Swiss-Prot record:
Alphabetical GO biological process terms: error-free translesion synthesis
InterPro entries in the cross-refs: ApaG_domain (IPR007474), ApaG_sf (IPR036767), Uncharacterised_ApaG (IPR023065)
Record domain ApaG: where: 3-127
Ranges that cross the membrane: none
Protein name per the record: Protein ApaG
The encoding gene: apaG
Length: 130
């Protein structure tokens, strides 16, 4: 489990390798990750967009930007949480992900909430970084 907190917004990520959706002979490794976003602050916020930086085991960077997460732009009041699970295919048995969520307060102020850097690793495969 990996965790970051920005301005009272806690982001926790739990990744896992999904063997049944992977095909190592075809250089396809699929990882799922579950994210829990908790508003520990005093103000209501809305998740507006996401920005991911995905780096495979060869060092190739892919950036992904988009509105919301899993088709939603959740609003979180103080003490509320939102969880979702998504996935990421890689051409290597390991890599990393990190990023930010753009959050907006009720008065229209925007800020970036950090998504912690986390590793994607096939169990029992030695990690080689380039």
């Amino acid at each position: 489990m990996y965790k970051a907190e920005t301005r009272g917004i806690s982001v926790t990520v739990t990744p896992r390798f999904v063997e049944e959706e992977s095909s190592p002979d075809e250089s396809r490794y699929f990882f799922a990750y579950t994210v829990e976003i908790t508003n520990n602050g005093r103000d209501k916020v809305q998740l507006r967009s996401r920005h991911w930086r995905i780096v495979d085991g060869r060092g190739a960077l892919q950036e992904v930007r988009g509105a919301g997460v899993v088709g939603k732009q959740p609003v979180l009041g103080p003490g509320e949480s939102f969880s979702y699970t998504s996935g990421c295919p890689l051409p290597t048995p390991n890599g990393t992900m990190e990023g930010t969520y753009t959050m907006a307060t009720a008065d229209g102020e925007s800020f970036e909430a950090a998504i912690p850097a986390f590793s994607l690793d096939v169990p029992h495969v030695r990690r080689v970084m380039h």
